[in-house]
From Swiss-Prot:
Source organism of the structure: Acanthamoeba polyphaga mimivirus (APMV)
Record's GO cellular component terms: membrane
Main location: membrane
Protein name, UniProt field: Uncharacterized protein L20
Membrane topology annotation: Multi-pass membrane protein
Transmembrane segments: 17-37, 60-80, 90-110
Record key words, sorted: Membrane, Transmembrane, Transmembrane helix
Subcellular location: Membrane
Length: 118
């Protein structure tokens, strides 16, 4: 069932689902600027689909996926090490921001590696 669902979905729908999870994760972690960025990409994808007949920018999808990997890494670290974060609430925001930037760079590098191989 999951395989059929994934085969019927195009890249646009998968990217939208990933970005929605990105917004939810950002809001849970308290990084509302990242949630606003994710909402911007959702709105932009909707308008691109409506007016440009579904033209998408694959580099944005790769960089968002890389950023989400960074965000979920921080979320997992925060869950397993929650006793250490109770002393200073700013540590988790700094950690999230830094790993999101690393994830963004990873996504950009990933996209460039894939496009140069093709």
């Amino acid at each position: 069932m999951f395989k059929n669902m994934m085969e019927n979905m195009n890249n646009k729908k998968i990217a939208m689902i990933i970005i929605i999870f990105y917004v939810i994760t950002s809001m849970v972690q308290g990084n509302y600027h990242f949630a606003i960025l994710g909402a911007y990409f959702i709105i932009k994808n909707i308008f691109e689909y409506k007016f440009n007949k579904g033209i998408e920018l694959p580099s944005i999808n790769y960089t968002i996926i890389g950023t989400i990997i960074g965000q979920y890494t921080v979320l997992i670290i925060m869950i397993f090490c929650r006793d250490n974060f109770s002393d200073n609430p700013y540590i988790e925001q700094i950690l999230t921001t830094n790993l999101s930037i690393v994830g963004y760079a990873f996504g950009s590098f990933w996209y460039r590696c894939i496009t140069t191989q093709n």
